[in-house]
Amino acid sequence: MSAASILGMGACTPLGVTAASSAAAFRAGIVRFREIDDSAVEPVRASYLSQIPWGRSCAERTLELTRRALLDLVRSFPLDSASRLAAWIGIAESEPEAVAVERALTGHLHAAFPGLVGPPTFLRHGRGAFFAALAAAQRALLARDCDLALVGAADSLCAPGPLERLARERRLLGPELEGVIPGEGAAFLLLARPGLVSRARGTLLCCATAREPRHRRQDAPNTAEALTAVFHELRADPTTQGRRADLLLTCETGEPFWTNELATAYLRNVPLMPEPFTRTTAAEGLGDLGAAGGAVMTALGLCWLARPLRPPVPESPQSLLMVCGSSDDGHVGACLIECTTKEEASR
């Protein structure tokens, strides 16, 4: 599949209302894990945007996060109203929240982007949703169904509905130090079809998705078949040319299930991985971002790599970012992005 250009990005997280401020705070080790006292659940720590009043629904919180992330994106790259723009958005898997979120975001997207080609496409794939959206957008750009693609994801696990569900499932982090810290966020990329622009923030080289039959919501041991296949597909893609990722970011929640899955897939795809092997997980600074994980971590990674990591060398390869994520229902995805330094982007 042909590469797609990344023209701009925007994000909103509890660490900052822009991609740049979120990335800087995360890298500095700042966290916003606050104790909340909700009558519906036991006292729990969560990572939430304090500017949104507590008690708002999942749809309301997701809409406000999306609104702020899109403002950040438009500042980074003003849209040309003459370009044909289509949208693919990743959202939560759960039915009650997903319906309300779709309704809220559809209205906002059409108001914010009057030239949107058709209705937005929503993918209810949890932590795997962003990668499914990315793959669908890349196919549409290649087929010239649109000139520009708005691709992103948004979610909030800090609303009453998701919090109650996590409490019922005993997923909340407790005294035994196993569980999740609920988080929330939104992030979006603006992609262009190959050859449309001469300058970009980065290049989406390839994206792969798969479905894991032994997912978290069933009882058989997870053997990481889907994540292994996704990594193998990225390795085999001609655009990667056998390169290793320089930076690996994951949507992991801090639960052992996901750590074991990644370790298994890593051992089967060592040539693709950073050397020495290191990774940064969403849980370290933002908790469980749900469906927003892939998009937010991609935006942070683009910020972190949008500067020279070493003295410039003629014809040296650009930094390679890999992001991956898996949902509770087995939707798995990963992508490889070649990042442009600030100097190169301004030429």
Regions found by a protein language model. Name each.
Residues 1-127, 131-135, 139-145, 154, ...:
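Conserved "HGTGT" condensation-loop signature of ketosynthase/thiolase-family condensing enzymes
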